Amino acid sequence: MINKIIFGYLILVTLVIADDYTSQRGMTNLLGVETNLRCSQQMSNPKAKTYELSYKRTASMPLSPFAGEYKPKFLPEIPWAGSRQVFTMDVLNENVNDGNQGTQMDALGHFGYTDEIWDGDGDADLSSLKYFGKLNGKEVKPTPESPLKKLGIESVPPIITTAVFLDVRKHIFNGKAMKAGEYVTVQHIEDTIKKSNVKDRGILPGDVVLINTGWSDNYQDPDDLGIYYTKAPGVSYNLVKYLSDKQVVGVGLDTWGVDTFAEEGEYGPERSQNPEGIANPAHHYFLTQSGVHTLENFNLKDLAKDSVDLSCVIILPLMTQGSSASPLRPVAIGVPTT
């Protein structure tokens, strides 16, 4: 009986959406009855616990280098020097870009790309700018100061689905945190699944995938050392395509960028997989090609401690019209196995 009540509630939550954004969505179009039912099975388990997946938002937490104002103000497209990529961002208050601070998710309109590499000098040529679904720059962001007219965070539905937690720190790196410049590979993920409680299930269409690298050991509040945002491990380009082929809805790490950031000489050999002219290959493929949302600064410590390899995750971005990202308070409901 409880399972039926929960199932009915989840269907109602999914259906109560004022506008039809299906044409602007990627993998979130897979959310529905099947993913709700999978979630209800986790939520109705009497041994299930609720886990906070966000960090407390404070003035002393690690701050993104992309901070800005906190009063609605929409910035022009921002080209990435040495890259064909262009990203969009809106700011709220001075020194605080709320959508890109703390635990957050990106809208599909957060990144676009051009035909030619911008060398960082002069104004970038945005005439070839494209976004997810091959939408051109003027369709998504008509003027430099405008909000996103398509692919904004308001187009993202409530994400209520099963989350597969993959602890590569535990199963691949013997409990040691990954280093900046290292990549999580397809082999790492496949080996982790074989060693985890989802070995018979694997990754299903509509899942969220959460990957624990251990980099969050550097997330300190107050952020006296200032290490966290300087660099990070991330996912390899082949893994990005692998997870996209699995038709996952979102991919989150305990890092600030999903992509890999490091000093020259620190990157692993998997860097050679990256396409030419793409500075942030995970953001590029997930957001502009496959329609998978990037989930950042997720607090996965409790899931790791309790080995919650499968859970129901609830991710509700703010419906800030025209914004390219949103702060989150995601939760997971699942059964501890340790």
PLM regions with names:
Residues N3-A18:
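Cleavable N-terminal signal peptides of Sec/SRP-targeted secreted and luminal proteins
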